[in-house]
Amino acid sequence: DVHLVLVSHAYSNSGQLAPLSDIIPMAKSRGILTLIDIAQSAGIVPLDLNTLKPDFLIGSSVKWLCGGPGAAYLWINPDQLQMCQPKDVGWFSHDNPFEFDIHDFRFHNSALKFWGGTPSIAPYVIAKHSIDYFAKIGSQEIREHNQQLMNLIAGEFPDKLISPIEPHQR
C-alpha cells in the first residue's frame, strides 16, 4: 500500500520538471497523499497551489530564491492540517509562545505547530529580503528570462544539453 507520494518538482541533475498536474490528481484519486519538494524550483517556476492542491509542500530559500541556507519551509494544505500532529513540542509551536504557562500548552492552529524551539533568525531575515526582491520582479518574469537563456544555450549546444528541449518540461 502507498500512503504518500514524494515528488521533486524539478530534478537538479537535468532540470526536468515533474508533471504535477498529472501526478497529484492521480494520487488523490487513489487516496494517496502528496508531498511536493520545490527546493529546486521555488522562485523560478510559478506554482498555483489552489489549482494543484497538493497535501504538503517543502522547500528552502537556497536555490533560485537566493536566501541562503537555514530557511526551509513546510506548507500544509488546510484540508490536511488537523490530521497532522507534531511529535515534539517547541517554544514556537505553542499557540501563545510568550504565555510561559507549562500547564496550559496549546499547539498553534496553523503549520506553526511544527516549529521547534528558538529559531536562528539570520536565515529568515536574509530569506525575507531575497523573497521580497524576487516577488517584486515576479516569478513569471524570472521564468521567461530563464527560458530565453536556456533557449540560447540549447541553440548553441544542442548535442551537449542534458535538460529537456521542450521549455514546459524544464
Locate each region found by the language model.
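Pyridoxal 5′-phosphate
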Residues: 1-170
